[in-house]
Amino acid sequence: MNIFNNHRTKEHLTSTQRNDFSFVSDNDIYLDSACQSLRPQPVLDAMISYFQEYNACGGRVKYQWGKQVDEAVEKTRASVLKRVGKSPKEYEVAFTLNTTYGLNLILNQLPERVYKQLVTSEIEHNSVFLPTMTIAKKLSIPRTILQREEDGSLKYTKDDVSGAIVVVNATSNIDGRTLQNAKVLEDDIHNASGILILDGAQSLVHDSSLLGSVDFDALCFSSHKTYGPSLGVVVVKKQLLDSLELSFVGGGMVEKLDENSFSLPKDDPSCSLEPGLQDFAGIIGLGAALDWLATYRPEGLTQKEHQQKLAHMMFEGLSRLPNIHILNREPSTTLSFYSDDVDAHRLAIFLSKQNIMARSGYFCCHYYLQNVKKYPPLLRLSLGLHNTERDVKTVLTDIEKIIINIK
């Protein structure tokens, strides 16, 4: 079936329209930033510079290239703390494979017989839902799945969080709803001897101010959703880090060692979550991404203004189409929906033929979308700082053509 009469010709937007994404042609409309954001040119440049100019190991050498790596890594740690509004006196920053790995690192090394229950919510990514399942069994404690309100708040009682390991997302990857009662939740958890671990994978580029207002015990997020390379980051309170019973150990973690014991370097606490050689290019790329995020103005607007404008266009445009069911109750840069007229996977394929890249399925949130809500597969449109008004108008036009012609 040929739904479209003609295809867009391949061309490039002007530098003022795409700025640091000039390598993205107008023919390509990428709408999967909730999975992985595109990398702006300064990030690519920083990584190439590392590979070409000082491609060495960090943390273990005395020569100049290695010292440059060490300085760049520490600069990135400082940039992470600044982005989430935390002090190096209270928190450490460690680099891992991804958000999932970071969450597993923390959860699987928590001490036994300290916490009496584990709490998560129904609208969690599998990177939270599965590890909380396995760690509750490992620690022999009950696991409770709580509801989230429409505004993203966690619905709980004080008994629910007493002595609890609470692991929830700060921002949903389905519809962008945020943990509105995060501060009250954190107070209740800490007053009852519990800990709060946040999945911040979707938060760093949208509303990092929420993270700054919450005294979380650990935060895990992904560089690759923050305009950096594929990398995970853990921001952890020193007190929690010191309590971990380490089982993921190896190179770069030794101050002293004998046949049956070892001690960690006193001047590098984060090494307890960083066994082995690190992805130095990735860490340097993340530092460049955070520097870029601090100053980038898409189409002359603030990032928030730009994102809100496109999100409203997308939400209002889809709302006008027939037989479309939008999960979002308000505009968001992450928007999910389904159509009565065309299956989400077919819709994604039709869009792909027009070089529009959108995600279809359940977005690793199977429990909430399939078990709780019993939705059919969904289509998710997630906007990034590279997107333009033209992108949104084109997508809305093409979705309308598909729905009209598929009947």
List the predicted regions and their residue ranges:
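Pyridoxal 5′-phosphate
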Residues: 1-407
